[in-house]
Regions:
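Hydrophobic alpha-helical connector segments
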Residues: 59, 70-102, 151-158
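Hydrophobic/aromatic-rich alpha-helical bundle segments in the mid-to-C-terminal region
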Residues: 98, 116-122, 126, 140-192
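A ubiquitous short alpha-helical element
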Residues: 56, 87-93, 119-126
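Solvent-exposed, amphipathic alpha-helical segments
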Residues: 13, 17-24, 71-75, 103, ...
Length: 195
């Protein structure tokens, strides 16, 4: 009797193969043949689970976003400094988060001129930025930041800083190391907290 096929597991393997391919070769290299080769499968398997390249890209992006959210929640859970934990969790500090960032950046490039993809990207970014803003509000309420700070402005600024530093770390990893990224976050938080 043939082994039971776990469709969710197969889809997940295909999505991870697509993410790795995007990270290694760019989104233009994403083909059924290359994905099939990465999982030692067939192109028929890829087309069975994903009816279009767009569907695969969307699922890959959503999977990377879900992984990032889970890591963010775990980092903040029980942290004595949830804002610092949040900012660090948003950065590409390890192989898994670098993979996610590479997929997000590729997706962002595709979203230019595509209203549906832009909406999805903007929604995810707004959710992350809102979280940073709420954590700043919490710090102000707890007396860890001066009340003169505008949470919306600083939330936007910190989120833009995280995005810029993350991009720099992908294109210039020799300079923008994980240690340097952590240092930059620490410096920014100290500046905010001292007023």
């Amino acid at each position: 009797m043939p082994a039971k096929v776990d469709a969710d597991e197969r889809r997940h393997r295909l999505v991870l193969a697509a993410a790795e391919l995007i990270a290694d070769e760019g989104i233009n290299a994403l083909t059924n043949a290359k994905i099939a080769k990465r999982i030692s499968g067939s192109t028929t398997l890829v087309t069975h689970y994903f009816h279009s390249k767009r569907e695969l890209i969307l699922d890959t992006y959503q999977t990377m976003a879900s992984r990032s959210r889970a890591r963010l929640e775990q980092a903040m859970s029980g942290s004595e400094d949830p804002l610092a934990a949040c900012l660090r969790a948003l950065l590409p500090l390890d192989d898994a988060s670098r993979l996610e960032w590479k997929v997000w950046l590729a997706y962002q490039g595709l979203s230019v001129g595509d209203p549906e993809l832009t909406r999805i990207w903007a929604s995810r970014a707004a959710t992350a930025q809102d979280r940073v803003t709420r954590l700043i509000e919490t710090d102000i309420s707890a007396g860890r930041m001066p009340s003169s700070i505008d949470p919306d402005t600083e939330g936007s600024r910190l989120f833009a800083l995280i995005q810029g530093m993350s991009f720099q770390s992908l294109v210039d990893p020799q300079r923008w190391t994980s240690g340097y990224l952590r240092q930059m976050v620490g410096t920014e938080l100290l500046r905010l907290r001292l007023g």
